[in-house]
Curated annotation (Swiss-Prot):
Gene that encodes the chain: rpoB
Protein family (similarity comment): Belongs to the RNA polymerase beta chain family.
Coiled coil ranges: none
SUPFAM superfamilies attached to this UniProt entry: beta and beta-prime subunits of DNA dependent RNA-polymerase
Reported function: DNA-dependent RNA polymerase catalyzes the transcription of DNA into RNA using the four ribonucleoside triphosphates as substrates.
Keyword annotations of the record: DNA-directed RNA polymerase, Nucleotidyltransferase, Transcription, Transferase
Taxonomic lineage of the native organism: Bacteria, Bacillati, Mycoplasmatota, Mycoplasmoidales, Mycoplasmoidaceae
Gene Ontology BP annotations: DNA-templated transcription
EC nos: 2.7.7.6
Name of the protein in question: DNA-directed RNA polymerase subunit beta
GO cellular component: DNA-directed RNA polymerase complex
Recorded catalytic activity of this chain's protein: RNA(n) + a ribonucleoside 5'-triphosphate = RNA(n+1) + diphosphate
Top-level lineage group: Bacteria
Pfam families xref list: RNA_pol_Rpb2_1, RNA_pol_Rpb2_2, RNA_pol_Rpb2_3, RNA_pol_Rpb2_45, RNA_pol_Rpb2_6, RNA_pol_Rpb2_7
First-level EC class: transferase
Length: 1434
C-alpha cells in the first residue's frame, strides 16, 4: 500500500466502500431528487386546493335573499390502497368534501348538506383528486403516470428592442424601438414603447377580438386611472418624452368640450345638460329632469353625465358671480374665488379621466358584462370598468412570480448601478446615507437594498389621484420611489428622474405605480439607465409544476360551478334574469312570488331550496379526470430502470399548452445559455426533433416558490468560504461574483490564490478573493444526475456524453446486477431517491426479514412493516423486484436503504456489468461498431434479463347473453388447451407458446334460426359452435414464456372491486420471458459507445491474456478516435487496475489477518459467504505457507470462489471518480503501479493471444474492465416476418409495422438492387401479387393451397392509378393484346376485373365445398367415437 494516498476511503453503506479520488471535499447534502414533484403536490393539497375552492365564495343571490358560504374542506383517505388500484385498473385518489352553508337572509334560516348515507360523510362530495405516491407518481386507471414540468416565459416586465403582438389567423404585429413588455400570467399583453425616431411614449395592447392591436398615448392611460396632467408632469419631473406625449393626445381642458368627432358624446351631453339647466326654473324640476336624463341609455355613461351636469352647474355659478362682480378685475376675482375655480378644474379633470377611460374601454373592446362591480348599476362607470380589467386578479393576474420580476426590474436599487446621483439619499432621521454626485457601486447597491427593505430611505412618495378615481385606495397601489440622476456621468449638466416601485409590494395585480415606473424605465433607456433583457435568459423563465397546472384546471371548474350556483340562486330568488318581469296576465312576478310563498306550507318552503339542489360538482370531476387522462404534460412514467424513472421526474419540457412546437426551428430557444449554469444540464437532451426542448434539472438545482430554478453556492466572506450556503436564481447570479469550486483553499477554507477565475454578469474574469461573494459547491452541480453518473465525462465529446446519458436510461435491469467498479459517487444517491429502493422511515432495529417483507421495531417501540415488491411488471415490461439487504438485529437509521430494487446492488445503482473488454478487430465481425461477445455472457446469464407481459381479458354481458369463462370452446384443439385448468384458466408455471390458450372464453352468437332436428343433434353431441363462438385469450407471436401469475377480479369480490356495469370479470395473465443476450441485441458503454451484437464466439475461441483469461467482449478500436470519447479508455485502465488490486487485497487481508468484516465492506458480499471465504483463503495461505499475495496461485483462489458461488466479478475494489473532479493522469498511473501493471514499457496495454491458434496478435492491445449495459432495443422485440396479413383499404398494399402484422417495404433502392441482378421474376412477384395486385394474390393463394403453379398475371392497383393520372393529363392509353389488337385501357381493365371475379367465385365455391366436407368428417368422427352416455342423453 502507498504511504501518500491520493484518495480517501469513503464508506457509502456498511457493505460499500469506494476509493474517492475527488479533490474538492464537501459535506453538502443535496436536495431530495424527487422534491420537484413531491413538494409541489404537497403545496397543492395543503394550500392551493382550499384557496381555489374558497375563492368563489361567498355567493349572494341577485336580490340578496340567499348567501352561500364556504365553511371548510375535508380531504379523506383513499378507499383503496395503491397496489389494489394498480391490480384492478383503478385510480389511486382521495375524495374531497366541502362544507357549505346556505343562509336565508330574510328569515335567518341556515341550511347545510345532510350526511351522506352511502359514505357516512358530512358535506358535499366535490370529487376525487389522484393522490401522489411516495415516489412522486400517480396511479391512473392502474398505470403509473407523472407530470412533466413545463418551462415557460415568466410573467413580468421585459425591456426589448423588438417585440410582437400575436393576432388572429397566425398574424403578428411587429414593433421596434425601446419597448417595455408587461407580460401577465392572465390578461392582455401590453407594450409601452418609444417608436424609432420619435420621443413620445405609446401603449399598445391587443383588442378583445384579437383582430388588431390598438395604440394610444401612455398619458391617456394614466389619465384614465385618475392622474391629472399636472400630477403626471410632477411625478416625471417635466421630462421631454412625457411633455410630448401630453401634447399629442387630446385629453386637455381646451379640447374636451369642442365639437369634434372624438368628443361627439361629450359635446352632446354638454349641450343637453345646458339645455336642461336653462329650461328649468325651479330646483326640483331641474333635479327631476337631470335624474331622468342621467338614467337614460347605458348605465356606464351615468357618471360622465353627472360630471358634465356638475360642470354646467359650477360654470353657471361662476358666471352668476362674475355678473354680480362685473366691476372687479379678473385677476382679483379669480384670486377671491379660487376655491370655485379649483372645484371646476377638478370636475374638468374628472370628465377628462372618465372620457379617457371610455375611449380605452371601447378601443380594447373590454367586456363590461363580466365586471363584478357592474352588477350594482349604481356604481357603474367606464373608469371602474377599466380598473376592474387591469386591477382585478381574476381578470388580470401577474402572479407572485410576476411581482418578483417587476421588483427586480423596477426597484431603484436595480437601476442605479454605475450612475451618478444628483440628490442626497437620506434616511428617515435625515442622515445622509449616500451624498449626491456619488457614483453608485456594488457596495452602495447592497446598502440601498438593505435600507429599502427596512423602509428607512426617505424617497417614497404617493400618487395623487382624482377623488372619483379608485373605489378603495390601496397604499401599495399608489406608492413609488424616485431620485434624480445625471444623464451623463462625466458632464453632469442635465438630470433625469428615475421613478421606481416602492419596495415590499406583495400585490399580484397590476398597480398604478407599476405603470408609472414602467413609463420611467422607457425614457430612462435614452440615457443608458437600465438594460435590455435577454429573452433566453433563465431568469426570464420559470417552471410550471404540478400544483400550478392542477390549480389552473380546478380554477376553471370552480368558475363553471360558480356560474351554475348563480343561476340556481337567481331562480330561487325569483329573479332568474336579474329583472322583475311581467307574466302573461300582466301581474308583476314579484307579486306572484309573494302569493306563491304565502300559499306554501312551512315544510314546502324548507324543501324549496337546499345546498345540494344549487350545486353541481360534475364539472369538477370531469375536468380533473380529463387533466390526468389527456393533458399533454401527463405522461407514462419510464420505469426501465431507477435512473430512467428519476430522470423522468426531473425532466423539463418547453412544449405543451402555450409552449413551443417541436417543428419550431429557432436555435436560440434550444441552445445552451450561460444562465443554465448549475440549473439546467447542458448535456442531457434528446436527439432529433426535440433537442433543446426537453431538458433535465442539474444535480443540485431546486425550484423556488415562484417557479424559478435556483442553484446552491457557499457564501464567501473576506476570502473565506463559509459553511453556510444560499440558493440563488439566475438573475441573482448576475449580481454576484461567483468563483469556481476548484480554487485552492487552506485548512481554514481561506482562498490561497491571489486571483481566482469567477463569473460576474454573464462573463468570466479574474478577481481577488476578497471580491468574491459566492463559490460553487462541487463541479458536478453543472450537469444532471444521468450525466453525473458517467466517469471521465470531461474527456468525452459533448455529443457522445449526451448519448451516454440517454442510453443509461435505456439499460435493462439484469438478473444479477453489479454496481460499476469505476463509479462517480452518485450511484447511491440516484438509487436511494429513485423511489424503487426500500428506505427506512424511522430509526430502529430489524426484527424480521424474508423475501416478502421487512419488519423494523422503531425507537418509539412500534413496528414498521415494509412489504417488498415481488416480480411486478413495470410500464416498460421489465421486472420490478425488491430484495432485502439487512439482517435481523441490525440497527438501521432513518432514510437508510434496507432493500434493493431492480438494477441495484447494496443500495447503489447497478445498470450493467463490469466486463473484460479488448479493443481489437477480429475477422471483421466488429466492423462499424458491431460487438463480439463471448459465449460466457450467454451461458452464465451475465446479460440475462427478465421481462413480464400482461395479457388481459374481460368477460362481458352482451345483448345475446353473458360471456363465459370455460375450458369448452368450439373448434379449439386439445393441444392449444393443454395448460388450462377445469375453469378454463391457464396454470401458473406453464410454459406457453404462440397459439396456446391462456383463458378460455365463449361469446353467445346472435339468434340464428335452426331446424328442430339440428337443435336436437347439437344437444346430443354438445356442439356449441352454432350458439357460441370462441373468443379466448391466446398467446400472440413473440410473447411466449412462462406464466408467472394469474389475477381474477370479480365485481362480487370481498375486496369490493368495482367493475363497469357490463363487465362480469377481468382476468389478467402475466407471462415472464427470460431473455439471454443474443445476436441483434444492442449494447453500450457509458460514453456513447454503442453497438449491436454481431457474433457470439465460443469461450475457447476468444482471444486471451497471458494468464489465460479470455476476453468477454471485443470492441472496434476505430470507434474511439473519431468519436472523441476518450473517457472509455481511462475507465478501461482504471477498472482493470482496480480489479487486479481487488485480487491482491483478497489474499492480503487474510495474510494480514484483518478479519472477514473487511471482505464485507470492501467487496459487499454476504456475511456468511464472507466468513467462509476468509476461512478458506486463510487455510490456503497456511497450506502454501505464503508470506505475500504473489505467493498464491490465482487458479487456487478461482476454485475457492467457484465453490462459494462467486467469481472475480464479485472481487474488486470500487472507485469513485466524480465528474470534473475525479482521478487525473497521476492518479491513474499511481493505481496502475499499485496493481503491478507495466506502464513504462507497454503504456498499460497487453499482449493478446488468438484463441483459435494460440499465437499472439501483432502489437499491444488495450484490455481492461468496462461497464457495459444491455439496452432495451432487443432483437426479440424487433424481428418480424409475415406471409399474409392485413391490407390497406385505400392502396390495397400490405400495412406496415410489426404491431399491425405488416409487410416489409420494398422501396425504390431495393428495386434497383433486383434490377441490377436481373432478378425479373422476383421483382415481378414483389411489385404485383406481394403488393397490390388483388386478383393476382387471390389466385396465387388458391394455387398454393391446391399445389398448382403460381401465375402472376394481374394488374396492380398502383398501375391502374398511373393510367388514370396519365388520362387526366389528356393522354390516350391503349393495350396491345396477344392477338395484336389495340384495346382502350378502361375496357381492358373492365374485362380483366370481370374475368378475375368469375375466377374468384369458382375459387370460393371450391373452398366452401372443402370446408363443408371437412365439417362432415368432424361430425362423422364425433358420432362414431360415441362420446356420449345413452342414459344421460336419451
Amino acid at each position: 500500500m502507498q504511504n501518500n494516498k491520493n484518495y480517501t476511503e469513503k464508506f457509502i453503506t456498511d457493505k460499500v466502500m469506494r476509493r474517492d479520488y475527488s479533490k474538492i471535499k464537501s459535506n453538502f447534502e443535496g436536495p431530495n431528487l424527487l422534491e420537484i414533484q413531491v413538494e409541489s403536490f404537497k403545496r397543492f393539497m395543503e394550500k392551493d386546493l382550499k384557496e381555489v375552492i374558497s375563492s368563489i365564495f361567498p355567493l349572494k343571490s341577485p336580490q340578496g335573499k340567499y348567501t352561500l358560504a364556504f365553511k371548510g374542506l375535508k380531504i379523506k383517505q383513499p378507499t383503496k390502497d395503491e397496489s389494489a388500484c394498480r391490480d384492478e385498473g383503478k385510480t389511486f385518489e382521495t375524495p374531497i368534501y366541502i362544507d357549505l352553508e346556505l343562509t336565508d337572509n330574510y328569515t335567518g334560516e341556515v341550511k347545510r348538506a345532510q350526511r351522506n348515507t352511502k359514505t357516512g360523510e358530512d358535506g358535499i362530495y366535490l370529487g376525487a383528486i389522484p393522490k401522489m405516491t411516495e415516489k412522486g407518481t400517480f396511479v391512473i386507471n392502474g398505470i403509473e403516470k407523472f407530470v412533466i414540468s413545463q418551462i415557460v416565459r415568466s410573467p413580468g416586465i421585459y425591456v426589448l428592442g423588438k417585440s410582437s403582438i400575436k393576432l388572429n389567423g397566425s398574424r403578428k404585429r411587429l414593433f421596434e424601438g425601446k419597448i417595455c413588455e408587461i407580460y401577465p400570467s392572465k390578461g392582455t399583453l401590453m407594450l409601452g414603447y418609444i417608436p424609432k425616431d420619435r420621443h413620445n411614449i405609446q401603449i399598445v395592447a391587443r383588442d378583445s377580438s384579437g383582430d388588431n392591436a390598438q395604440t394610444f398615448s401612455v398619458t391617456t392611460l394614466l389619465k384614465a386611472f385618475g392622474l391629472t396632467s399636472a400630477e403626471i408632469l410632477k411625478i416625471f419631473n417635466n421630462e421631454k418624452e412625457i411633455r410630448e406625449s401630453l401634447e399629442i393626445e387630446k385629453y386637455a381642458p381646451e379640447y374636451i368640450f369642442e365639437n369634434s368627432q372624438e368628443n361627439e358624446i361629450i359635446f352632446k351631453i354638454y349641450s343637453d345638460a345646458h339645455d336642461i339647466h336653462e329650461k328649468a326654473d325651479r330646483r326640483e324640476s331641474n333635479n327631476k329632469l337631470k335624474e331622468e336624463y342621467i338614467e337614460q341609455g347605458s348605465p356606464l355613461l351615468s357618471k360622465l353625465k353627472q360630471l358634465i351636469f356638475n360642470y354646467v352647474e359650477k360654470n353657471d355659478e361662476i358666471d352668476a358671480l362674475l355678473h354680480e362682480n362685473k366691476d372687479v378685475e379678473d385677476a382679483s376675482f379669480i384670486k377671491n374665488n379660487k376655491k370655485l375655480y379649483d372645484e371646476r378644474e377638478e370636475i374638468i379633470n374628472c370628465i377628462i379621466s372618465e372620457k379617457a377611460a371610455k375611449d380605452i374601454v371601447e378601443l380594447l373592446g373590454i367586456n363590461i358584462k363580466n365586471i363584478e362591480t357592474l352588477r350594482h348599476l349604481g356604481k357603474a362607470s367606464y373608469q371602474i370598468a377599466l380598473q376592474q380589467h387591469f386591477f382585478n386578479k381574476r381578470l388580470y393576474d401577474i402572479s407572485s412570480a410576476g411581482r418578483y420580476k417587476f421588483e427586480k426590474k423596477l426597484l431603484l436599487s436595480e437601476r442605479l448601478y454605475q450612475k451618478v446621483i444628483a440628490n442626497d439619499i437620506i434616511d428617515k432621521k435625515n442622515n445622509i446615507l449616500i451624498p449626491k454626485d456619488t457614483l453608485i457601486t456594488k457596495e452602495h447597491i447592497e446598502l440601498i437594498k438593505k435600507e429599502s427593505r427596512d423602509k428607512n430611505i426617505k424617497w417614497t412618495k404617493k400618487i395623487n389621484l382624482l377623488p372619483t378615481a379608485l373605489e378603495s385606495e390601496i397604499e401599495q397601489f399608489l406608492e413609488y420611489e424616485s431620485i434624480a440622476v445625471y444623464k451623463d456621468n462625466d458632464l453632469r449638466d442635465e438630470t433625469t428622474e428615475i421613478v421606481g416601485l416602492a419596495s415590499g409590494c406583495k400585490l399580484q395585480t397590476l398597480t398604478v405605480a407599476d405603470l408609472v415606473a414602467t413609463t420611467s424605465y422607457i425614457y430612462n433607456l435614452n440615457y443608458e439607465i437600465g438594460e435590455f433583457d435577454d429573452i433566453d435568459h433563465l431568469g426570464n423563465k420559470r417552471l410550471k409544476l404540478i400544483h400550478e397546472l392542477l390549480r389552473a384546471r380546478i380554477a376553471t371548474s370552480m368558475a363553471r360551478i360558480e356560474k351554475f350556483i348563480n343561476e340556481k340562486l337567481a331562480i330561487s330568488d325569483g329573479s332568474s334574469n336579474n329583472i322583475t318581469n311581467v307574466n302573461d296576465k300582466g301581474i308583476d312576478t314579484e307579486l306572484d312570488r309573494e302569493i306563491e310563498e304565502s300559499d306554501m306550507s312551512d315544510e314546502e318552503k324548507k324543501k324549496a331550496i337546499s345546498v345540494k339542489s344549487i350545486i353541481n360538482t360534475k364539472q369538477f370531476q370531469s375536468l380533473v379526470k380529463d387533466f390526468f387522462n389527456s393533458h399533454q404534460l401527463i405522461q407514462f412514467i419510464d420505469q426501465q430502470n431507477p435512473l430512467a424513472e428519476l430522470t423522468n421526474k426531473r425532466r423539463i419540457s418547453a412544449m405543451g399548452p402555450g409552449g413551443i412546437s417541436r417543428e419550431d426551428p429557432n436555435l436560440d430557444i434550444r441552445d445552451v445559455h450561460h444562465s443554465h449554469y448549475s440549473r439546467i444540464c447542458p448535456i442531457e437532451t434528446p436527439e432529433g426533433m426535440n433537442i433543446g426542448l426537453i431538458m433535465s434539472l442539474a444535480s443540485l438545482a431546486k425550484v423556488d416558490e415562484n417557479g424559478f430554478i435556483v442553484a446552491p453556492y457557499y457564501v464567501v466572506e473576506d476570502g473565506v468560504v463559509k459553511e453556510d450556503y444560499k440558493y440563488l436564481t439566475a438573475h441573482e447570479d448576475d449580481n454576484y461574483i461567483i468563483a469556481e469550486s476548484s480554487v485552492q483553499l487552506d485548512e481554514n477554507k481561506r482562498i490561497l490564490d491571489e486571483q481566482v477565475v469567477a463569473r460576474y454578469r454573464g462573463s468570466t474574469g479574474l478577481f481577488s478573493p476578497n471580491e468574491v461573494d459566492f463559490i460553487d459547491i462541487v463541479p458536478k452541480q453543472v450537469v444532471s444526475i444521468a450525466a453525473s453518473a458517467i466517469p471521465f465525462i470531461e474527456n468525452d465529446d459533448g455529443a457522445r456524453a449526451l448519448m451516454g446519458s440517454n442510453m443509461q436510461r435505456q439499460a435493462t435491469p439484469l438478473i444479477k446486477p453489479y454496481a460499476p467498479i469505476v463509479g462517480t459517487g452518485t450511484e447511491f444517491k440516484i438509487a436511494h431517491d429513485s423511489g424503487m429502493a426500500v428506505v427506512a422511515k424511522n430509526d430502529g432495529v430489524v426484527e424480521f426479514v424474508d423475501s416478502q417483507k421487512i419488519i423494523i421495531r422503531n425507537d418509539n417501540d412500534k413496528l414498521d412493516d415494509y412489504k417488498l415488491i415481488k416480480y411486478r411488471k413495470s410500464n416498460q415490461d421489465t421486472c420490478n423486484n425488491q430484495i432485502p439487504i439487512v439482517k435481523v438485529g441490525q440497527r438501521v437509521h432513518k432514510s437508510e436503504t434496507i432493500g434493493d430494487g431492480p438494477a441495484m446492488q447494496n443500495g447503489e445503482l447497478a445498470l450493467g456489468r463490469n466486463i473484460l473488454v479488448g479493443y481489437t478487430t477480429w475477422r471483421g465481425y466488429n466492423f462499424e461498431d458491431a460487438i463480439i461477445i463471448s459465449e460466457r455472457l450467454v451461458d452464465q446469464d451475465v446479460f440475462t434479463s427478465i421481462h413480464i407481459d400482461e395479457h388481459t381479458i374481460q368477460c362481458m354481458k352482451t345483448k345475446n347473453g353473458d360471456e363465459e369463462i370455460t375450458r369448452d370452446m368450439p373448434n379449439v384443439s386439445d393441444t392449444a388447451k393443454r395448460f388450462l385448468d377445469n375453469q378454463g384458466i391457464v396454470l401458473v408455471g406453464a410454459e406457453v407458446h404462440e397459439g396456446d390458450v391462456l383463458v378460455g372464453k365463449t361469446t353467445p352468437r346472435g339468434n340464428v334460426e335452426t331446424a328442430p332436428e339440428d337443435r336436437l343433434l347439437q344437444t346430443i353431441f354438445g356442439d356449441k359452435s352454432k350458439t357460441v363462438k370462441d373468443s379466448s385469450l391466446k398467446v400472440k407471436h413473440g410473447q411466449e414464456g412462462i406464466v408467472a401469475a394469474v389475477k381474477r377480479i370479480k365485481s362480487s369480490d370481498e375486496n369490493g372491486s368495482e367493475l363497469p356495469d357490463d363487465v362480469i370479470e377481468i382476468i389478467k395473465v402475466y407471462i415472464v420471458q427470460k431473455r439471454k443476450i443474443q445476436v441483434g441485441d444492442k449494447m453500450a458503454g457509458r460514453h456513447g459507445n454503442k453497438g449491436i451484437v454481431s457474433k457470439v464466439v465460443p469461450i475457447q475461441d476468444m482471444p486471451f491474456l497471458k494468464d489465460g483469461t479470455p476476453l468477454d467482449i471485443m470492441l472496434n478500436p476505430l470507434g474511439v478516435p473519431s468519436r472523441m470519447n476518450i473517457g472509455q479508455i481511462l475507465e478501461l485502465h482504471l477498472g482493470y487496475a482496480a480489479a487486479e488490486i481487488g485480487k491482491k487485497q483478497l489474499i492480503q487481508i487474510a495474510i494480514d489477518q484483518l478479519g472477514y468484516e473487511k471482505y464485507i465492506s470492501l467487496f459487499g458480499i454476504n456475511e456468511i459467504i464472507a466468513k467462509k471465504l476468509y476461512e478458506n483463503i486463510s487455510n490456503l495461505i497456511k497450506h502454501k505457507q505464503a508470506k505475500q499475495a504473489k505467493d498464491i496461485d490465482l487458479i487456487d483462489v478461482t476454485i475457492i470462489l467457484k465453490e462459494l458461488g462467486l467469481s472475480y466479478d464479485d472481487i474488486g475494489i470500487k472507485i469513485s471518480t466524480p465528474v470534473f473532479d475525479g482521478a487525473n493522469h497521476d492518479d491513474i498511473v499511481s493505481i496502475m503501479n499499485e496493481a503491478n501493471i507495466d506502464i513504462e514499457n507497454n503504456k498499460g496495454k497487453q499482449v493478446l493471444y488468438d484463441g483459435r491458434t494460440g499465437e499472439p496478435f501483432d502489437g499491444l492491445i488495450s484490455v481492461g474492465l468496462t461497464y457495459m449495459l444491455k439496452l432495451d432495443h432487443m432483437v426479440d422485440d424487433k424481428i418480424h416476418s409475415r406471409s399474409v396479413g392485413p391490407y390497406s383499404k385505400i392502396t390495397q398494399q400490405p400495412l406496415g409495422g410489426k404491431s399491425q402484422n405488416g409487410g416489409q417495404r420494398f422501396g425504390e433502392m431495393e428495386v434497383w438492387a433486383l434490377e441490377a441482378y436481373g432478378a425479373a421474376y422476383n421483382l415481378l412477384e414483389i411489385l404485383t401479387i406481394k403488393s397490390d395486385d388483388v386478383q393476382g394474390r387471390n389466385q396465387a393463394y388458391n394455387a398454393i393451397i391446391k399445389g398448382h403453379d403460381v401465375v402472376a398475371d394481374g394488374m396492380p392497383e398502383s398501375f391502374k392509378l398511373l393510367t388514370k393520372q396519365m388520362q387526366g393529363l389528356g393522354l390516350c392509353i391503349t393495350v396491345e393484346t396477344k392477338d395484336d389488337r389495340m384495346v382502350d385501357i378502361n375496357e381492358y381493365t373492365l374485362n380483366q376485373n370481370r374475368l378475375n371475379n368469375d375466377d374468384d367465385e369458382v375459387i370460393l365455391d371450391e373452398n366452401l365445398k372443402e370446408i363443408n366436407d371437412s365439417n362432415e368428417e368432424i361430425f362423422n368422427t364425433n358420432f362414431n367415437n360415441n362420446d356420449y352416455d345413452d342414459e344421460e342423453n336419451f
